[in-house]
Regions:
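Glycine-rich S-adenosyl-L-methionine
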Residues: 197-206
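SAM cofactor-binding core of SAM-dependent methyltransferases
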Residues: 17, 21-98
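A short acidic (Asp/Glu
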Residues: 37-39, 61, 176, 193-197
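SAM-dependent nucleic-acid methyltransferase catalytic core
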Residues: 1-12, 66-184, 188-193
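Extended aliphatic helical segments
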Residues: 26, 35-38, 50, 106, ...
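Residue-level signal for functionally critical sites in structured catalytic/ligand-binding pockets
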Residues: 3-10, 27, 43-44, 49-58, ...
Length: 206
């Protein structure tokens, strides 16, 4: 739904073609959830779709888009796209990050997606994150995100996400593990674990 480190937007259809039949579809490392969105015509067979990400701000974006779509859209539209002053203000509000908030925080989700959509390739946000000035040559990814969550087709698939979690991958796998569940696991890139907000160690790839 947005640019994100390790997103599978362009590989999604190929990946989904190799999925076995299933009733529940789960991504323990949800990220931008591109495999679900791009290959939804193949995933629609699932009775239950489950999103999880250990990055609470990313999970919060999906929660707001799914359960508070009107309030989220209203908040998004309040802010001028491609404004460096707004970017820096939101950056000072959010960084360094904390997880002392509940899923459904629309204002926080708006600030996060504003930063995330206007930094290099949706890179993980930190103190060094810089504003990408498009100089009016292109529409910002912030505007593209607004278009998605106000589009009926995208809303249909957003509403098709039955459960949104902010848990460890172990917790999610243990909760949903059964013969009818398909887990698509796309963990942080090997040897690039430090690029992610969540604490995922190299040995955990095993």
């Amino acid at each position: 739904m947005f640019s994100y480190l390790g997103g599978k937007k362009f590989q999604a259809k190929w990946i989904a073609r190799h999925f076995p039949k299933h009733k529940t579809y789960v991504e323990p490392f949800g990220g931008a959830y591109w495999v679900y969105f791009v290959a939804n015509h193949q995933i629609d067979q699932a009775h239950t779709n489950v999103y999880n990400d250990f990055n609470k701000d990313i999970a919060n974006i999906f929660y707001c888009a799914r359960h508070k779509d009107r309030a989220f859209l209203k908040e998004l539209l309040l802010h001028e796209p491609q404004n460096e002053d707004i970017f820096n203000l939101f950056k000072s509000d959010l960084i360094p990050f904390n997880t002392d908030f509940e899923l459904g925080d629309v204002e926080r989700a708006t600030k996060y997606i504003y930063l995330q959509s206007q930094s290099f390739s949706g890179d993980t946000l930190n103190e060094k994150t810089k504003f990408i000035n498009l100089k009016g040559k292109y529409r910002s990814k912030y505007e593209h995100f607004i278009n998605k969550i106000s589009n009926k087709k995208w809303l249909y698939h957003i509403k098709g996400i039955n459960h949104i979690h902010n848990e460890s991958y172990e917790t999610i796998i243990n909760e949903y593990d059964n013969d009818d569940t398909l887990f698509y696991c796309d963990p942080p890139y090997f040897k690039m674990e430090d690029y992610y907000v969540q604490d995922f160690q190299r040995h955990q790839h095993k």
